[in-house]
Structures are given as structure tokens and as C-alpha cells.
Amino acid sequence: MTQTTHHTPDTARQADPFPVKGMDAVVFAVGNAKQAAHYYSTAFGMQLVAYSGPENGSRETASYVLTNGSARFVLTSVIKPATPWGHFLADHVAEHGDGVVDLAIEVPDARAAHAYAIEHGARSVAEPYELKDEHGTVVLAAIATYGKTRHTLVDRTGYDGPYLPGYVAAAPIVEPPAHRTFQAIDHCVGNVELGRMNEWVGFYNKVMGFTNMKEFVGDDIATEYSALMSKVVADGTLKVKFPINEPALAKKKSQIDEYLEFYGGAGVQHIALNTGDIVETVRTMRAAGVQFLDTPDSYYDTLGEWVGDTRVPVDTLRELKILADRDEDGYLLQIFTKPVQDRPTVFFEIIERHGSMGFGKGNFKALFEAIEREQEKRGNL
């Protein structure tokens, strides 16, 4: 059964107790930020725009800030842990491998957002504080979410620097691609333990005033061997969308079970990146060495019958293994990378939307079977 709740953005904004401007950054804790920055530059077409490290006074960590459109990644490695934050990052990489430590959200008032969140049950991991330099002032605060992930609340209204105070502008690592690869971060998906999905959905409902956008349970989100459940929470403007998955009992180990085992607990499973031209994006990324999940040719034999006309011909979708889905609002095109590190944990989705604000419900079976084939190769099904 699938339940869908549609929003009326204008009404939602008027009553929004926790207004947001959008995703500020996805912050990764990684073993080698310099190499990771090179990978995301060459493989994903991201552009280095800012840096913080020993050369400009940061003795404990090195961080590389990469952007493409409004999508921003921050890749951070510990050089020599000396503070609780440095030890936390080092322990995070040791336990989880490379992974997302922070889904930072831009807000118009970080102090008010933090106060509202704490009043409604969130755990603070950083009280509101200011960072200043010649570019202005940024106000930040942070709250905990599932696993060891946090949400830093960022108010950069009075700031025009390259990222945050303490960072300096940096030149791209490689020649920027001829075409912008991505437009924005579309959504960020979290995996949580069995029986805890509703707990975390309730957390976002209560702490951030987010509402339930979609729900996927039962046959919609199962194969012959594995199953999971998923609910999507979003702010009133739909700028910030967080699907939350949990495993369901089935014959074999699901992709969520595999993630939880190898990540060592709950965390961010994948980041969806919005593109205006998925064909160009996938061709460019494939040429740069990014591996995508495979889709059997049989998927495309009847695709045109139930999806209808799309911007991209079915033959091109078949060639590139891109999935398509249609709902009452329009259609979307999507494809998923394989995990981008040796642990079968974090991966990416590329999505092109044409009216649809869905998540590819019609593709779930094909997608999960593709993931199961990869699990079987790894001996984890």
C-alpha cells in the first residue's frame, strides 16, 4: 500500500514553525580528503571552491569544499586529532568508513531554529555560535539525528565568503566540465534499524515541523527475496526531503540490512542529485569511470506503454540503463551508482524531474533486483 500526501507550499510556508532555505551542504568524514576531492572532481564534475587545512591555520583537519550548481559537498579528514571534534571524525571513519557525518541545512535564523528543535525534543550537539572573518558572520548550531549523523543549522545571511570563516577560496582541481553536471541536491536518504523508521519520522515531524510526503510499504517495495519500508519527510517548500528506510522481514538480507551491517549502524545511504540533462550527465560520469547499476533489457520492452512519452527516447534509456517512472504530476528519469567506496554503503542517485515529485515507485522492483544482483556478487544476499 502506498499513501501520498501532497503539500500546498504557500500555506505550508505561512505556518512553518521551522523555516528552511534548503540544503546547505553534505559533509563527509573520509580517510583521505585530498584523494576524495580529486575523485569527486574528476568523476562527478564537482568544482573545488574552498579549502581549510594546515596552510591556513587548521592544524587538526583538512577540508575541501566542492560544488556543482547549488549542490555542495564538504570532504573532511583528520590530520592529527586534538579536540573532541577531531577524535569524533577519526572514530567515525574507523567505525563507518567514508560516510556522511552532517546533513547541513540553511536556515534564516539558526538560533531560533535550534531553540525550536531543542524545545521539541532534539539533542543539541552544538549550541548557537558565530564565526567571523572579512566576509561577514555566519551563525551555526547543530542537533543530532539518526546514528552518528547531525544537522548543522547554518545562517549565512550576513556572509559572502566562499564557504565559512576559516576557509579560503581554492581553484578547481581539474578543468571544469563543459556542462554543469548537477543542479542541486534533490533528497538525502537515511537507513535506520528495524522498528525505528516511525521513531525518526516522528522526530522530523516534531522537531522540524516536517510533514510526511510519501510512504512505501508492502508489495510496492519488495522482491521475491528481500523487503524494506520507507517514509519520506519534507519541509513545507519541498526544498529539503529526507526519505527514511528500515529493513523488513524477508527470506534474505535486504540492501538495508547489508548497509547497517557494513556501516555499523544507522546513517545516510544515498544522496540524490538533480540534473537538467540526465543523458549528458550519465555519459560524462561513465566516461570518467563512475559505475552504475545495471538494468535488464527486458525492463525497457514495455516501458513506453506505461510511462508514455518522455524527453529521452526509450532506446537511449535502454542504452544508458536509465529508469523512468510516471505519476499523476508528471514523470522522472533516474539512475543509481554502485557504492562509491569498498564498503557497500554510500551511493548516489541521478534524477531528472518533469513535474513528478515522486521517488520512482514504479522502478522499485527493478532497482532492488539490480541491487540484489550486486549483493550476491559480494556474498551478502
Curated annotation (Swiss-Prot):
Its EC number is 1.13.11.27. Fe cation binds at H187, H270, E349. Residues 22-156, 184-338 form the VOC domain. It comes from the Bacteria. Binds 1 Fe cation per subunit. Its cofactor is Fe cation. One of its GO terms (biological process) is L-phenylalanine catabolic process. Coiled coil: none annotated. It is an enzyme of class 1 (oxidoreductase). It catalyses: 3-(4-hydroxyphenyl)pyruvate + O2 = homogentisate + CO2. The keyword Repeat applies. Keywords: Dioxygenase, Iron, Metal-binding, Oxidoreductase, Phenylalanine catabolism, Repeat, Tyrosine catabolism. Belongs to the 4HPPD family. This is 4-hydroxyphenylpyruvate dioxygenase. The lineage of its organism: Bacteria, Bacillati, Actinomycetota, Actinomycetes, Kitasatosporales. The gene is hpd.
